From Swiss-Prot:
Gene that encodes the chain: rpsA
Function (record text): Binds mRNA; thus facilitating recognition of the initiation point. It is needed to translate mRNA with a short Shine-Dalgarno (SD) purine-rich sequence.
Protein name: Small ribosomal subunit protein bS1
GO terms (BP aspect): translation
Database matches in SUPFAM superfamilies: Nucleic acid-binding proteins
A Gene Ontology term for the protein's cellular component: cytosolic small ribosomal subunit
Length: 559
């Protein structure tokens, strides 16, 4: 208690008479077990429970002969005894101190001891005061743990003893303390300057640092060169730290601070330390759905994309390959210094099954595998090393197409194929099933050239023409215009399914695998051949005389 408060209190005692509720002065005459006997100049001595004389540390604060202030509860309680209370006296003293502090705009000391709606409760010399949440500090504070249980200074901003209502402010004390210091600091603060500060508060995005009357924001991205999830990984409330002033807005009194800028930037000359293709050990620091981050050195992290984790499984979740804290070998794939990004690969440090396959097998080799899946565009075959090869729809059968071609296959079937091509860079292996056998179309075309006369059976017929089965799954096309020299409006009026026809091959398109037939052309050729044969027979049937006569007559005419 200050000297003025003590004088005020003593003066108040002089003006009191010995009525119940009065604060009087007594002498401790005995301390016996659970009771303290006090002589206050009344008819009888009063006894007070000894626990009213213990401090917060559990220590007895009086001894025999000490002068104490006590409250008079009753001059005689019916048994001829005087009832006194040290607690009520202490409470009265506290109210006098609060009233004096309120009137003089001076500070009082108290302890934050609880949370209530809208703020906190503060014990000020035994009086329960209310501290609004907005008046805890000069800026909003989410976490007050570091303030609770400590003796702090407050100003009384509202006081009503009758209603037992006391409101205090810590913010007013801080603003008063910081005013002069703040002005001096604002005058001297410069960008690039290194200063000391105390961490006041932590948020998800950074920490507020008290520089001495001025708060600065240390953003989470300026705490360390490495990736961190929360500021508490680097600093704690109450820490005294050195920081660098990155930006100072004098008009708005806003200060941006940096901690990592006090050390050397690890990204300087990063490409010289980690050339593309370098293999190093790295520590996994974080997992995401799209990959994992790995630390090459303090402050330098790279991303291993999920596609660079495994040669054969492109959609594997990173947690199936690595865990946070794992030490893994990685290869540097690319460094973007400007964007501070490093692309890393794990699979590049392992044997490439595509290159292994390419070195082991050649185009034309036969290889067996198990059908893993059947899609609209082909069949995927599982091969050794965990890789797949594709039999494209067009390489399943020489004659069947679409669903017809894949109908006889199912998942899990063991299948023999021919290697058509291997592209390790694009990670593609093309396989073929139909290439296990000779191409029946090519064989047929080599035996039946253009102009050949062939026999077949009508397989299908519509108005425009017919499909002719030539045997060995070879088909020919007979258009309506090629059925007869006479005009055919509807091929169905001339041909029937199952009917045998004889026709001439008028074209073979090896690329589209189409053989065009013509009965009309065959009939024309047959007629020409018949005419030649007829003329030949007529010449042979005429005798030598007849021939000589003809020659002679011709010579005569010429003459």
């Amino acid at each position: 208690m200050s000297e003025s408060f003590a004088e005020l209190f003593e003066e108040s005692l002089k003006s009191l008479d010995m009525q119940p509720g009065a604060i009087i002065t007594g002498i401790v005459v005995d301390i016996d077990g659970d009771w303290v006997t006090v002589h206050a100049g009344l008819k009888s001595e009063g006894v007070i429970p000894v626990e009213q004389f213990y401090n917060e540390q559990g220590e007895l604060t009086i001894k025999v002969g000490d002068e104490v202030h006590v409250a008079l509860d009753a001059v005689e309680d019916g048994f001829g005894e005087t009832k006194l209370s040290r607690e009520k006296a202490k409470r009265a003293e506290s109210w006098i101190v609060l009233e004096a502090a309120f009137a003089a705009d001076e500070v009082v000391k108290g302890v934050i001891n609880g949370k209530v709606k809208g703020g906190f409760t503060v014990d000020v010399n035994g009086i329960r005061a209310f501290l609004p949440g907005s008046l805890v500090d000069v800026r909003p504070v989410r976490d007050t743990t570091h303030l609770e249980g400590k003796e702090l200074e407050f100003k009384v901003i509202k006081l009503d003893q009758k209603r037992n209502n006391v409101v205090v402010s810590r913010r007013s004390v801080l603003e008063a303390e910081n005013s002069a210091e703040r002005e001096a600091l604002l005058e001297s603060l410069q960008e690039g300057q290194q200063v000391k500060g105390i961490v006041k508060n932590l948020t998800d995005y950074g920490a507020f640092v008290d520089l001495g009357g001025v708060d600065g924001l240390l953003h989470i991205t300026d705490m360390a060169w490495k990736r961190i999830k929360h500021p508490s990984e680097i600093v704690n409330v109450g820490d005294e730290i050195d920081v660098k002033v990155l930006k100072f807005d004098r008009e708005r009194n806003r200060v941006s601070l940096g901690l990592k800028q006090l050390g050397e930037d690890p990204w300087v000359a990063i490409k010289a330390r980690y050339p593309e293709g370098t293999r190093v050990m790295a520590r996994v620091t974080n997992l995401t759905d799209y990959g994992c981050f790995a630390e090459l050195e303090e402050g330098v992290e790279g991303l291993v994309h999920v596609s660079e984790m495994d040669w054969t499984n492109k959609n594997i979740h990173p947690s199936k390959v690595v865990q946070v804290g794992d030490e893994v070998e990685v290869q540097v794939l690319d460094i973007d210094e400007e964007r501070r990004r490093i692309s890393l690969g794990i699979k590049q440090c392992k044997s490439n099954p595509w290159e292994d396959f390419s070195s082991q097998f050649n185009k034309g080799d036969r290889i067996s595998g198990t059908i893993k899946s059947i899609t609209d565009f082909g069949i995927f075959i599982g091969l050794d090393g965990g890789i797949d090869g594709l039999v494209h729809l067009s390489d399943i059968s020489w004659n069947e197409v679409g669903e017809e071609a894949v109908r006889r296959f199912k998942k899990g079937d063991e299948l023999e194929t021919v290697i058509l091509s291997v592209d390790p860079e694009r990670e593609r292996i093309s396989l073929g099933i139909k290439q296990l056998e000779d191409d029946p179309f090519s064989n047929y075309a080599s035996l039946h050239e253009k102009g050949s006369i062939v026999r077949g059976t009508v397989k299908e017929v519509d108005a425009k023409g017919a499909v002719i089965s030539l045997g060995d799954d070879i088909e020919g096309i007979l258009k309506a215009s090629e059925i007869s020299r006479d005009r055919v409006e509807d091929a169905r009026n001339v041909l029937k399914e199952g009917e045998e026809v004889e026709a001439k091959i008028i074209s073979i398109d090896r690329k589209s695998r189409v053989i065009s037939l013509s009965v009309k052309s065959k009939d024309v050729d047959d007629e020409k051949d018949a005419m030649k044969e007829l003329r030949k027979q007529e010449v042979e049937s005429a005798g030598p005389t007849t021939i000589g006569d003809l020659i002679r007559a011709q010579m005569e005419n010429q003459g």
